[in-house]
């Protein structure tokens, strides 16, 4: 697992942003339309296993067809940002090269290789925070790319890292923008795990002492999938935030299909229900039913769930009565609804916050969230000292 150590280039005289050619070099990196040389490499599959899978898939055509359907379904519906589109890629490139490199924030683009996937990523921070050990890992929604979050939607990253006193690691899923490989559910989870390892790696990674995972919409689901089989580092503090995330993808999708067909067609309820049942079954059959509830309930770390509610300001929720449709997700299809409806209640280190913002609106009260994050980190330190 090695390529280049980046840790010693984050602060001091050797810091990448203190070099006289920082702007020229970074601008050159941003202009590249292909991945940069790999900074961090993790191989999770043995070569023999990978070869056997490839041969098996080739021999048995139904498996190859199934994999093709899995990818195409993702490109069209689950992760449309991965659907090949030359015009969108031009826009993303324009967003990337237009980053203001003279601002207080410093940027470094890099590549993380996970088996055969090369993931395009970027670290963002300030000279005053790069050595504080706190990092936020952002996972995007299904139509987004990291280029938007450093461009037109910069407040979605800059706001949190400012209020969280954190640095950021942002990335694109497989198949999105410059990241290689097709969108594949297990690989997306695997990528999230490797990025989490990269953050905590003291030798070749970023040596994070505190990690905030911030997943929006699909990103919350990917976060949960990645953490399902991930062993958290007991030397690192964690807080995971899921913003406007679904309970499971089949429920969320069928609710959206039903709402759309009810508004746009004159079909009978029974016909619409039949189509919804088919859609739900298809999502499950082709293995795209990302389930956020189970991963959230099993998570061994503090967690904050943000969900649209009938509130004027941010508010802790203890029941689901104030949850409302957020413009994309029906209230009934949200992770918050599922957790608040659980007779066992929430975990002791889990909270749900009702917010007035709709699904894709920027968060308006980051100080409120930052306060909860600080409390959770403080509680973890007390627990670690006592154990």
What kind of feature is each model-predicted range?
Residues 1-63, 77-97, 384-387:
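Non-Sec secretion/translocation targeting segments of pathogen effectors
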Residues 182-204:
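Alpha/beta-hydrolase active-site loop
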Residues 115-163, 173-178:
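Short, surface-exposed "cap/lid" segments of acyl-processing enzymes
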Residues 173, 241-252:
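Active-site nucleophile loop of the alpha/beta-hydrolase fold
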Residues 87-127:
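N-terminal cap/lid segment of alpha/beta-hydrolase-fold proteins
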């Amino acid at each position: 697992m090695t390529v280049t150590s980046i840790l010693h280039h984050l602060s001091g005289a050797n810091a990448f942003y203190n070099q006289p050619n920082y702007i020229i070099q970074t601008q050159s990196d941003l202009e590249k339309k292909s991945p940069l040389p790999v900074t961090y490499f993790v191989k999770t599959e043995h070569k023999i296993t990978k070869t056997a899978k490839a041969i098996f898939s080739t021999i048995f055509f139904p498996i190859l067809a199934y994999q093709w359907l899995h990818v195409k379904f993702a490109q069209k519906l689950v992760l449309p940002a991965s659907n090949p589109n030359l015009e969108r890629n031009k826009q993303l490139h324009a967003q990337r090269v237009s980053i203001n490199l003279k601002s207080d924030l410093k940027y470094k683009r890099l590549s993380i290789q996970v088996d055969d996937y090369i993931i395009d990523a970027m670290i963002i921070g300030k000279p005053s925070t790069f050595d504080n050990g706190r990092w936020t890992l952002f996972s995007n929604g299904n139509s987004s790319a990291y280029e938007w979050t450093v461009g037109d939607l910069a407040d979605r990253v800059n706001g949190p890292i400012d209020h969280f006193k954190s640095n950021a690691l942002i990335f694109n899923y497989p198949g999105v923008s410059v990241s290689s490989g097709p969108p594949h559910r297990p690989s997306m989870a695997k990528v999230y795990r490797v990025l989490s390892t990269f953050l905590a790696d003291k030798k070749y990674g970023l040596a994070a002492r505190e990690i905030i995972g911030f997943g929006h919409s699909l990103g919350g689901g990917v976060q949960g999938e990645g953490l399902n089989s991930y062993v958290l580092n007991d030397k690192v503090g964690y807080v995971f935030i899921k913003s406007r995330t679904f309970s499971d993808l089949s429920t969320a999708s069928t609710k959206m299909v039903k709402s759309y067909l009810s508004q746009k067609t004159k079909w009978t309820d029974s016909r619409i229900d039949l189509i919804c049942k088919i859609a739900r079954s298809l999502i499950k059959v082709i293995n795209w039913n990302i389930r956020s509830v189970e991963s959230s309930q099993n998570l061994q770390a503090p967690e904050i769930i943000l969900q649209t509610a009938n509130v004027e300001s941010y508010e802790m929720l203890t029941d689901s009565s104030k949850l409302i449709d957020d413009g994309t997700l029906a209230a009934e299809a949200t992770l918050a609804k599922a957790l608040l409806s659980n007779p066992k209640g929430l975990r002791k280190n889990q909270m749900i916050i009702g917010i007035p913002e709709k699904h894709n609106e920027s968060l308006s009260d980051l100080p409120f969230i930052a306060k909860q994050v600080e409390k959770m980190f403080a509680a973890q330190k007390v627990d670690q000292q006592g154990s």
